[in-house]
C-alpha cells in the first residue's frame, strides 16, 4: 500500500466502500431528487386546493335573499390502497368534501348538506383528486403516470428592442424601438414603447377580438386611472418624452368640450345638460329632469353625465358671480374665488379621466358584462370598468412570480448601478446615507437594498389621484420611489428622474405605480439607465409544476360551478334574469312570488331550496379526470430502470399548452445559455426533433416558490468560504461574483490564490478573493444526475456524453446486477431517491426479514412493516423486484436503504456489468461498431434479463347473453388447451407458446334460426359452435414464456372491486420471458459507445491474456478516435487496475489477518459467504505457507470462489471518480503501479493471444474492465416476418409495422438492387401479387393451397392509378393484346376485373365445398367415437 494516498476511503453503506479520488471535499447534502414533484403536490393539497375552492365564495343571490358560504374542506383517505388500484385498473385518489352553508337572509334560516348515507360523510362530495405516491407518481386507471414540468416565459416586465403582438389567423404585429413588455400570467399583453425616431411614449395592447392591436398615448392611460396632467408632469419631473406625449393626445381642458368627432358624446351631453339647466326654473324640476336624463341609455355613461351636469352647474355659478362682480378685475376675482375655480378644474379633470377611460374601454373592446362591480348599476362607470380589467386578479393576474420580476426590474436599487446621483439619499432621521454626485457601486447597491427593505430611505412618495378615481385606495397601489440622476456621468449638466416601485409590494395585480415606473424605465433607456433583457435568459423563465397546472384546471371548474350556483340562486330568488318581469296576465312576478310563498306550507318552503339542489360538482370531476387522462404534460412514467424513472421526474419540457412546437426551428430557444449554469444540464437532451426542448434539472438545482430554478453556492466572506450556503436564481447570479469550486483553499477554507477565475454578469474574469461573494459547491452541480453518473465525462465529446446519458436510461435491469467498479459517487444517491429502493422511515432495529417483507421495531417501540415488491411488471415490461439487504438485529437509521430494487446492488445503482473488454478487430465481425461477445455472457446469464407481459381479458354481458369463462370452446384443439385448468384458466408455471390458450372464453352468437332436428343433434353431441363462438385469450407471436401469475377480479369480490356495469370479470395473465443476450441485441458503454451484437464466439475461441483469461467482449478500436470519447479508455485502465488490486487485497487481508468484516465492506458480499471465504483463503495461505499475495496461485483462489458461488466479478475494489473532479493522469498511473501493471514499457496495454491458434496478435492491445449495459432495443422485440396479413383499404398494399402484422417495404433502392441482378421474376412477384395486385394474390393463394403453379398475371392497383393520372393529363392509353389488337385501357381493365371475379367465385365455391366436407368428417368422427352416455342423453 502507498504511504501518500491520493484518495480517501469513503464508506457509502456498511457493505460499500469506494476509493474517492475527488479533490474538492464537501459535506453538502443535496436536495431530495424527487422534491420537484413531491413538494409541489404537497403545496397543492395543503394550500392551493382550499384557496381555489374558497375563492368563489361567498355567493349572494341577485336580490340578496340567499348567501352561500364556504365553511371548510375535508380531504379523506383513499378507499383503496395503491397496489389494489394498480391490480384492478383503478385510480389511486382521495375524495374531497366541502362544507357549505346556505343562509336565508330574510328569515335567518341556515341550511347545510345532510350526511351522506352511502359514505357516512358530512358535506358535499366535490370529487376525487389522484393522490401522489411516495415516489412522486400517480396511479391512473392502474398505470403509473407523472407530470412533466413545463418551462415557460415568466410573467413580468421585459425591456426589448423588438417585440410582437400575436393576432388572429397566425398574424403578428411587429414593433421596434425601446419597448417595455408587461407580460401577465392572465390578461392582455401590453407594450409601452418609444417608436424609432420619435420621443413620445405609446401603449399598445391587443383588442378583445384579437383582430388588431390598438395604440394610444401612455398619458391617456394614466389619465384614465385618475392622474391629472399636472400630477403626471410632477411625478416625471417635466421630462421631454412625457411633455410630448401630453401634447399629442387630446385629453386637455381646451379640447374636451369642442365639437369634434372624438368628443361627439361629450359635446352632446354638454349641450343637453345646458339645455336642461336653462329650461328649468325651479330646483326640483331641474333635479327631476337631470335624474331622468342621467338614467337614460347605458348605465356606464351615468357618471360622465353627472360630471358634465356638475360642470354646467359650477360654470353657471361662476358666471352668476362674475355678473354680480362685473366691476372687479379678473385677476382679483379669480384670486377671491379660487376655491370655485379649483372645484371646476377638478370636475374638468374628472370628465377628462372618465372620457379617457371610455375611449380605452371601447378601443380594447373590454367586456363590461363580466365586471363584478357592474352588477350594482349604481356604481357603474367606464373608469371602474377599466380598473376592474387591469386591477382585478381574476381578470388580470401577474402572479407572485410576476411581482418578483417587476421588483427586480423596477426597484431603484436595480437601476442605479454605475450612475451618478444628483440628490442626497437620506434616511428617515435625515442622515445622509449616500451624498449626491456619488457614483453608485456594488457596495452602495447592497446598502440601498438593505435600507429599502427596512423602509428607512426617505424617497417614497404617493400618487395623487382624482377623488372619483379608485373605489378603495390601496397604499401599495399608489406608492413609488424616485431620485434624480445625471444623464451623463462625466458632464453632469442635465438630470433625469428615475421613478421606481416602492419596495415590499406583495400585490399580484397590476398597480398604478407599476405603470408609472414602467413609463420611467422607457425614457430612462435614452440615457443608458437600465438594460435590455435577454429573452433566453433563465431568469426570464420559470417552471410550471404540478400544483400550478392542477390549480389552473380546478380554477376553471370552480368558475363553471360558480356560474351554475348563480343561476340556481337567481331562480330561487325569483329573479332568474336579474329583472322583475311581467307574466302573461300582466301581474308583476314579484307579486306572484309573494302569493306563491304565502300559499306554501312551512315544510314546502324548507324543501324549496337546499345546498345540494344549487350545486353541481360534475364539472369538477370531469375536468380533473380529463387533466390526468389527456393533458399533454401527463405522461407514462419510464420505469426501465431507477435512473430512467428519476430522470423522468426531473425532466423539463418547453412544449405543451402555450409552449413551443417541436417543428419550431429557432436555435436560440434550444441552445445552451450561460444562465443554465448549475440549473439546467447542458448535456442531457434528446436527439432529433426535440433537442433543446426537453431538458433535465442539474444535480443540485431546486425550484423556488415562484417557479424559478435556483442553484446552491457557499457564501464567501473576506476570502473565506463559509459553511453556510444560499440558493440563488439566475438573475441573482448576475449580481454576484461567483468563483469556481476548484480554487485552492487552506485548512481554514481561506482562498490561497491571489486571483481566482469567477463569473460576474454573464462573463468570466479574474478577481481577488476578497471580491468574491459566492463559490460553487462541487463541479458536478453543472450537469444532471444521468450525466453525473458517467466517469471521465470531461474527456468525452459533448455529443457522445449526451448519448451516454440517454442510453443509461435505456439499460435493462439484469438478473444479477453489479454496481460499476469505476463509479462517480452518485450511484447511491440516484438509487436511494429513485423511489424503487426500500428506505427506512424511522430509526430502529430489524426484527424480521424474508423475501416478502421487512419488519423494523422503531425507537418509539412500534413496528414498521415494509412489504417488498415481488416480480411486478413495470410500464416498460421489465421486472420490478425488491430484495432485502439487512439482517435481523441490525440497527438501521432513518432514510437508510434496507432493500434493493431492480438494477441495484447494496443500495447503489447497478445498470450493467463490469466486463473484460479488448479493443481489437477480429475477422471483421466488429466492423462499424458491431460487438463480439463471448459465449460466457450467454451461458452464465451475465446479460440475462427478465421481462413480464400482461395479457388481459374481460368477460362481458352482451345483448345475446353473458360471456363465459370455460375450458369448452368450439373448434379449439386439445393441444392449444393443454395448460388450462377445469375453469378454463391457464396454470401458473406453464410454459406457453404462440397459439396456446391462456383463458378460455365463449361469446353467445346472435339468434340464428335452426331446424328442430339440428337443435336436437347439437344437444346430443354438445356442439356449441352454432350458439357460441370462441373468443379466448391466446398467446400472440413473440410473447411466449412462462406464466408467472394469474389475477381474477370479480365485481362480487370481498375486496369490493368495482367493475363497469357490463363487465362480469377481468382476468389478467402475466407471462415472464427470460431473455439471454443474443445476436441483434444492442449494447453500450457509458460514453456513447454503442453497438449491436454481431457474433457470439465460443469461450475457447476468444482471444486471451497471458494468464489465460479470455476476453468477454471485443470492441472496434476505430470507434474511439473519431468519436472523441476518450473517457472509455481511462475507465478501461482504471477498472482493470482496480480489479487486479481487488485480487491482491483478497489474499492480503487474510495474510494480514484483518478479519472477514473487511471482505464485507470492501467487496459487499454476504456475511456468511464472507466468513467462509476468509476461512478458506486463510487455510490456503497456511497450506502454501505464503508470506505475500504473489505467493498464491490465482487458479487456487478461482476454485475457492467457484465453490462459494462467486467469481472475480464479485472481487474488486470500487472507485469513485466524480465528474470534473475525479482521478487525473497521476492518479491513474499511481493505481496502475499499485496493481503491478507495466506502464513504462507497454503504456498499460497487453499482449493478446488468438484463441483459435494460440499465437499472439501483432502489437499491444488495450484490455481492461468496462461497464457495459444491455439496452432495451432487443432483437426479440424487433424481428418480424409475415406471409399474409392485413391490407390497406385505400392502396390495397400490405400495412406496415410489426404491431399491425405488416409487410416489409420494398422501396425504390431495393428495386434497383433486383434490377441490377436481373432478378425479373422476383421483382415481378414483389411489385404485383406481394403488393397490390388483388386478383393476382387471390389466385396465387388458391394455387398454393391446391399445389398448382403460381401465375402472376394481374394488374396492380398502383398501375391502374398511373393510367388514370396519365388520362387526366389528356393522354390516350391503349393495350396491345396477344392477338395484336389495340384495346382502350378502361375496357381492358373492365374485362380483366370481370374475368378475375368469375375466377374468384369458382375459387370460393371450391373452398366452401372443402370446408363443408371437412365439417362432415368432424361430425362423422364425433358420432362414431360415441362420446356420449345413452342414459344421460336419451
From Swiss-Prot:
CDD domains referenced in this protein's UniProt entry, alphabetically: RNA_pol_B_RPB2
Disulfide bond residue pairs: none
CC terms in the record's Gene Ontology section: DNA-directed RNA polymerase complex
Listed Pfam families: RNA_pol_Rpb2_1, RNA_pol_Rpb2_2, RNA_pol_Rpb2_3, RNA_pol_Rpb2_45, RNA_pol_Rpb2_6, RNA_pol_Rpb2_7
Keywords: DNA-directed RNA polymerase, Nucleotidyltransferase, Transcription, Transferase
UniProt record, GO biological process: DNA-templated transcription
Catalytic activities: RNA(n) + a ribonucleoside 5'-triphosphate = RNA(n+1) + diphosphate
Matches recorded under InterPro entries: DNA-dir_RNA_pol_bsu_ext_1_sf, DNA-dir_RNA_pol_bsu_external_1, DNA-dir_RNA_pol_su2, DNA-dir_RNAP_su2_dom, DNA-dir_RNAP_su2_hyb_sf, RNA_pol_bsu_bac, RNA_pol_bsu_CS, RNA_pol_bsu_protrusion
Superkingdom of origin organism: Bacteria
GO molecular function: DNA binding; DNA-directed RNA polymerase activity; ribonucleoside binding
EC number: 2.7.7.6
PROSITE patterns: RNA_POL_BETA (PS01166)
Known role: DNA-dependent RNA polymerase catalyzes the transcription of DNA into RNA using the four ribonucleoside triphosphates as substrates.
Subunit structure: The RNAP catalytic core consists of 2 alpha, 1 beta, 1 beta' and 1 omega subunit. When a sigma factor is associated with the core the holoenzyme is formed, which can initiate transcription.
Similarity-based family: Belongs to the RNA polymerase beta chain family.
Name of protein: DNA-directed RNA polymerase subunit beta
Amino acid at each position: 500500500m502507498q504511504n501518500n494516498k491520493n484518495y480517501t476511503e469513503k464508506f457509502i453503506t456498511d457493505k460499500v466502500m469506494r476509493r474517492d479520488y475527488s479533490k474538492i471535499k464537501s459535506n453538502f447534502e443535496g436536495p431530495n431528487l424527487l422534491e420537484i414533484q413531491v413538494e409541489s403536490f404537497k403545496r397543492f393539497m395543503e394550500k392551493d386546493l382550499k384557496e381555489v375552492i374558497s375563492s368563489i365564495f361567498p355567493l349572494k343571490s341577485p336580490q340578496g335573499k340567499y348567501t352561500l358560504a364556504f365553511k371548510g374542506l375535508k380531504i379523506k383517505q383513499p378507499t383503496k390502497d395503491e397496489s389494489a388500484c394498480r391490480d384492478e385498473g383503478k385510480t389511486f385518489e382521495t375524495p374531497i368534501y366541502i362544507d357549505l352553508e346556505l343562509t336565508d337572509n330574510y328569515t335567518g334560516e341556515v341550511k347545510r348538506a345532510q350526511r351522506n348515507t352511502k359514505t357516512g360523510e358530512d358535506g358535499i362530495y366535490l370529487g376525487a383528486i389522484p393522490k401522489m405516491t411516495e415516489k412522486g407518481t400517480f396511479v391512473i386507471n392502474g398505470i403509473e403516470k407523472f407530470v412533466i414540468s413545463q418551462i415557460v416565459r415568466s410573467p413580468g416586465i421585459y425591456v426589448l428592442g423588438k417585440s410582437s403582438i400575436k393576432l388572429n389567423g397566425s398574424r403578428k404585429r411587429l414593433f421596434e424601438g425601446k419597448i417595455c413588455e408587461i407580460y401577465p400570467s392572465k390578461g392582455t399583453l401590453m407594450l409601452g414603447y418609444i417608436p424609432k425616431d420619435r420621443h413620445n411614449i405609446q401603449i399598445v395592447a391587443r383588442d378583445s377580438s384579437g383582430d388588431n392591436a390598438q395604440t394610444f398615448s401612455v398619458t391617456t392611460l394614466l389619465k384614465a386611472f385618475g392622474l391629472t396632467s399636472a400630477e403626471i408632469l410632477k411625478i416625471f419631473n417635466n421630462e421631454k418624452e412625457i411633455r410630448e406625449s401630453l401634447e399629442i393626445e387630446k385629453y386637455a381642458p381646451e379640447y374636451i368640450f369642442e365639437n369634434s368627432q372624438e368628443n361627439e358624446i361629450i359635446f352632446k351631453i354638454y349641450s343637453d345638460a345646458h339645455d336642461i339647466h336653462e329650461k328649468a326654473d325651479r330646483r326640483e324640476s331641474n333635479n327631476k329632469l337631470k335624474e331622468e336624463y342621467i338614467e337614460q341609455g347605458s348605465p356606464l355613461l351615468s357618471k360622465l353625465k353627472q360630471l358634465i351636469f356638475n360642470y354646467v352647474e359650477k360654470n353657471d355659478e361662476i358666471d352668476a358671480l362674475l355678473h354680480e362682480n362685473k366691476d372687479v378685475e379678473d385677476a382679483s376675482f379669480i384670486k377671491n374665488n379660487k376655491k370655485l375655480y379649483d372645484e371646476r378644474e377638478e370636475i374638468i379633470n374628472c370628465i377628462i379621466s372618465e372620457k379617457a377611460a371610455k375611449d380605452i374601454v371601447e378601443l380594447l373592446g373590454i367586456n363590461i358584462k363580466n365586471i363584478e362591480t357592474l352588477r350594482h348599476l349604481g356604481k357603474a362607470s367606464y373608469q371602474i370598468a377599466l380598473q376592474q380589467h387591469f386591477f382585478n386578479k381574476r381578470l388580470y393576474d401577474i402572479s407572485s412570480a410576476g411581482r418578483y420580476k417587476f421588483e427586480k426590474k423596477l426597484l431603484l436599487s436595480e437601476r442605479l448601478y454605475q450612475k451618478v446621483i444628483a440628490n442626497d439619499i437620506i434616511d428617515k432621521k435625515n442622515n445622509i446615507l449616500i451624498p449626491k454626485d456619488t457614483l453608485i457601486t456594488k457596495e452602495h447597491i447592497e446598502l440601498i437594498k438593505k435600507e429599502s427593505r427596512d423602509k428607512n430611505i426617505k424617497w417614497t412618495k404617493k400618487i395623487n389621484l382624482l377623488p372619483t378615481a379608485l373605489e378603495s385606495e390601496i397604499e401599495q397601489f399608489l406608492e413609488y420611489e424616485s431620485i434624480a440622476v445625471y444623464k451623463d456621468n462625466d458632464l453632469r449638466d442635465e438630470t433625469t428622474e428615475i421613478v421606481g416601485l416602492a419596495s415590499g409590494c406583495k400585490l399580484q395585480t397590476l398597480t398604478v405605480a407599476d405603470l408609472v415606473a414602467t413609463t420611467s424605465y422607457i425614457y430612462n433607456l435614452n440615457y443608458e439607465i437600465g438594460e435590455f433583457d435577454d429573452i433566453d435568459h433563465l431568469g426570464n423563465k420559470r417552471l410550471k409544476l404540478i400544483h400550478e397546472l392542477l390549480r389552473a384546471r380546478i380554477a376553471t371548474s370552480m368558475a363553471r360551478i360558480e356560474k351554475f350556483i348563480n343561476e340556481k340562486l337567481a331562480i330561487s330568488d325569483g329573479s332568474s334574469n336579474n329583472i322583475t318581469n311581467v307574466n302573461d296576465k300582466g301581474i308583476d312576478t314579484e307579486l306572484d312570488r309573494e302569493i306563491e310563498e304565502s300559499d306554501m306550507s312551512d315544510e314546502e318552503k324548507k324543501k324549496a331550496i337546499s345546498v345540494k339542489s344549487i350545486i353541481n360538482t360534475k364539472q369538477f370531476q370531469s375536468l380533473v379526470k380529463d387533466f390526468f387522462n389527456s393533458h399533454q404534460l401527463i405522461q407514462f412514467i419510464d420505469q426501465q430502470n431507477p435512473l430512467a424513472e428519476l430522470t423522468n421526474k426531473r425532466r423539463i419540457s418547453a412544449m405543451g399548452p402555450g409552449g413551443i412546437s417541436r417543428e419550431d426551428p429557432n436555435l436560440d430557444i434550444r441552445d445552451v445559455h450561460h444562465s443554465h449554469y448549475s440549473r439546467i444540464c447542458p448535456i442531457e437532451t434528446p436527439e432529433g426533433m426535440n433537442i433543446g426542448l426537453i431538458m433535465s434539472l442539474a444535480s443540485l438545482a431546486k425550484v423556488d416558490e415562484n417557479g424559478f430554478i435556483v442553484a446552491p453556492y457557499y457564501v464567501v466572506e473576506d476570502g473565506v468560504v463559509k459553511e453556510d450556503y444560499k440558493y440563488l436564481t439566475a438573475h441573482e447570479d448576475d449580481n454576484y461574483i461567483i468563483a469556481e469550486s476548484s480554487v485552492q483553499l487552506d485548512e481554514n477554507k481561506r482562498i490561497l490564490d491571489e486571483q481566482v477565475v469567477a463569473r460576474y454578469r454573464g462573463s468570466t474574469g479574474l478577481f481577488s478573493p476578497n471580491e468574491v461573494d459566492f463559490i460553487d459547491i462541487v463541479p458536478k452541480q453543472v450537469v444532471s444526475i444521468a450525466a453525473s453518473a458517467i466517469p471521465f465525462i470531461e474527456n468525452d465529446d459533448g455529443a457522445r456524453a449526451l448519448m451516454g446519458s440517454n442510453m443509461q436510461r435505456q439499460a435493462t435491469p439484469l438478473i444479477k446486477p453489479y454496481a460499476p467498479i469505476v463509479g462517480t459517487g452518485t450511484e447511491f444517491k440516484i438509487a436511494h431517491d429513485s423511489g424503487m429502493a426500500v428506505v427506512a422511515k424511522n430509526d430502529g432495529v430489524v426484527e424480521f426479514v424474508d423475501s416478502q417483507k421487512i419488519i423494523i421495531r422503531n425507537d418509539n417501540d412500534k413496528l414498521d412493516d415494509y412489504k417488498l415488491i415481488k416480480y411486478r411488471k413495470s410500464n416498460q415490461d421489465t421486472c420490478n423486484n425488491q430484495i432485502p439487504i439487512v439482517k435481523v438485529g441490525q440497527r438501521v437509521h432513518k432514510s437508510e436503504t434496507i432493500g434493493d430494487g431492480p438494477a441495484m446492488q447494496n443500495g447503489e445503482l447497478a445498470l450493467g456489468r463490469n466486463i473484460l473488454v479488448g479493443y481489437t478487430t477480429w475477422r471483421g465481425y466488429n466492423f462499424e461498431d458491431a460487438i463480439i461477445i463471448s459465449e460466457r455472457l450467454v451461458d452464465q446469464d451475465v446479460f440475462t434479463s427478465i421481462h413480464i407481459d400482461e395479457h388481459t381479458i374481460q368477460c362481458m354481458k352482451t345483448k345475446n347473453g353473458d360471456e363465459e369463462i370455460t375450458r369448452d370452446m368450439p373448434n379449439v384443439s386439445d393441444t392449444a388447451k393443454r395448460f388450462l385448468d377445469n375453469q378454463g384458466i391457464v396454470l401458473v408455471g406453464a410454459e406457453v407458446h404462440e397459439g396456446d390458450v391462456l383463458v378460455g372464453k365463449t361469446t353467445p352468437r346472435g339468434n340464428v334460426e335452426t331446424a328442430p332436428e339440428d337443435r336436437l343433434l347439437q344437444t346430443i353431441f354438445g356442439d356449441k359452435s352454432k350458439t357460441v363462438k370462441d373468443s379466448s385469450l391466446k398467446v400472440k407471436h413473440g410473447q411466449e414464456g412462462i406464466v408467472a401469475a394469474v389475477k381474477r377480479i370479480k365485481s362480487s369480490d370481498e375486496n369490493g372491486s368495482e367493475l363497469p356495469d357490463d363487465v362480469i370479470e377481468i382476468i389478467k395473465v402475466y407471462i415472464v420471458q427470460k431473455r439471454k443476450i443474443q445476436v441483434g441485441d444492442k449494447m453500450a458503454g457509458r460514453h456513447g459507445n454503442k453497438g449491436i451484437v454481431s457474433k457470439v464466439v465460443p469461450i475457447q475461441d476468444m482471444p486471451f491474456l497471458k494468464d489465460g483469461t479470455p476476453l468477454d467482449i471485443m470492441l472496434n478500436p476505430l470507434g474511439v478516435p473519431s468519436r472523441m470519447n476518450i473517457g472509455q479508455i481511462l475507465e478501461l485502465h482504471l477498472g482493470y487496475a482496480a480489479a487486479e488490486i481487488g485480487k491482491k487485497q483478497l489474499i492480503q487481508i487474510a495474510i494480514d489477518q484483518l478479519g472477514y468484516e473487511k471482505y464485507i465492506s470492501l467487496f459487499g458480499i454476504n456475511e456468511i459467504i464472507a466468513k467462509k471465504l476468509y476461512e478458506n483463503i486463510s487455510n490456503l495461505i497456511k497450506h502454501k505457507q505464503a508470506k505475500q499475495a504473489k505467493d498464491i496461485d490465482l487458479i487456487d483462489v478461482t476454485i475457492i470462489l467457484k465453490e462459494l458461488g462467486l467469481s472475480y466479478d464479485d472481487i474488486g475494489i470500487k472507485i469513485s471518480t466524480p465528474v470534473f473532479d475525479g482521478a487525473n493522469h497521476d492518479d491513474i498511473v499511481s493505481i496502475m503501479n499499485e496493481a503491478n501493471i507495466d506502464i513504462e514499457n507497454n503504456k498499460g496495454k497487453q499482449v493478446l493471444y488468438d484463441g483459435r491458434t494460440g499465437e499472439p496478435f501483432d502489437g499491444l492491445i488495450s484490455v481492461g474492465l468496462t461497464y457495459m449495459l444491455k439496452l432495451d432495443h432487443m432483437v426479440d422485440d424487433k424481428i418480424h416476418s409475415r406471409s399474409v396479413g392485413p391490407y390497406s383499404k385505400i392502396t390495397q398494399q400490405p400495412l406496415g409495422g410489426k404491431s399491425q402484422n405488416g409487410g416489409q417495404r420494398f422501396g425504390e433502392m431495393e428495386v434497383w438492387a433486383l434490377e441490377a441482378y436481373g432478378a425479373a421474376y422476383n421483382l415481378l412477384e414483389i411489385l404485383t401479387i406481394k403488393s397490390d395486385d388483388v386478383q393476382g394474390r387471390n389466385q396465387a393463394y388458391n394455387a398454393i393451397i391446391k399445389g398448382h403453379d403460381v401465375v402472376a398475371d394481374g394488374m396492380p392497383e398502383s398501375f391502374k392509378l398511373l393510367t388514370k393520372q396519365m388520362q387526366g393529363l389528356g393522354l390516350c392509353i391503349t393495350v396491345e393484346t396477344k392477338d395484336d389488337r389495340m384495346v382502350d385501357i378502361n375496357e381492358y381493365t373492365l374485362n380483366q376485373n370481370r374475368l378475375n371475379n368469375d375466377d374468384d367465385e369458382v375459387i370460393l365455391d371450391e373452398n366452401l365445398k372443402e370446408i363443408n366436407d371437412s365439417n362432415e368428417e368432424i361430425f362423422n368422427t364425433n358420432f362414431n367415437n360415441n362420446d356420449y352416455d345413452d342414459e344421460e342423453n336419451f
